[in-house]
Regions:
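Positively charged n-region of N-terminal signal peptides that target proteins for export
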Residues: 1-6
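Short beta-to-alpha linker loops that shape the active-site pocket of alpha/beta-hydrolase fold enzymes
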Residues: 74, 102-107
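N-terminal cap/lid segment of alpha/beta-hydrolase-fold proteins
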Residues: 22-61
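A conserved short beta-strand
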Residues: 162-169
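Gly/Ala-rich beta-loop-alpha elbow adjacent to hydrolase catalytic centers
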Residues: 144-153
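Bacterial N-terminal signal peptides
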Residues: 7-16
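Short, surface-exposed "cap/lid" segments of acyl-processing enzymes
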Residues: 52, 60-95, 99
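Alpha/beta-hydrolase active-site loop
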Residues: 112-136
């Protein structure tokens, strides 16, 4: 029995040592690369309680007191030109303010399953975005996720009590 206990202790220690955290240096490189290229919206820094992360807020043409938090896919950023930028800008034509946020990311060679340990970082980021929007007076808040952002949004909703009014993923 003592042998099993020792093995479990060693395994628990090994898993703890291998736990990954978001690649904050890569996040900063993305932020530096895109900050001056934003044509629609304003960049901002949000804080998840441990670190600052990039957000891009874009006001709707018509002020309808509703906002969408947009979450990108694996390894990219909150202004990804192929999907996220058209979504965050296009929704403003339909009365939605958008806040596209930097989700936790890993190095370029990381595969999809390697992201699982980062899911603990998801709730603080989404909560920071929700809190910002509430402080700005938005009452109706929805989450929209693409690819890994969809999975992270699903994980968030399954594990957190929230008053967001919708989810598209």
């Amino acid at each position: 029995m003592k042998t099993i206990s020792n093995i479990l202790t060693i395994l628990a220690f090994a898993f703890t040592c291998n736990a990954q955290a978001s690649d904050l240096a890569k996040e900063q490189r993305w932020a530096d690369a895109i900050e001056d290229t934003i044509m629609d919206g304003e960049t901002m820094l949000l804080n998840d309680g441990k670190s600052d992360f990039l957000g891009i807020f874009t006001e709707a043409i018509e002020d309808k007191n509703r906002a969408a938090i947009i979450m990108h896919g694996t390894g990219i950023h909150p202004d990804w030109q192929q999907v996220i930028n058209p979504l965050r800008v296009g929704l403003t034509d339909h009365g939605w303010h958008t806040l596209s946020i930097q989700m936790p990311i890993l190095a370029n060679d990381a595969e999809y399953p390697a992201y699982a340990p980062l899911y603990d970082e998801v709730a603080p980021r989404i909560n920071a975005a929700i809190n910002y929007l509430k402080e700005e007076g938005y009452k109706k808040i929805v989450l929209i996720g693409h690819s890994q952002g969809s999975t992270m949004g699903t994980y968030y909703l399954a594990n957190n009590k929230t008053d967001v009014t919708g989810f598209v993923g």
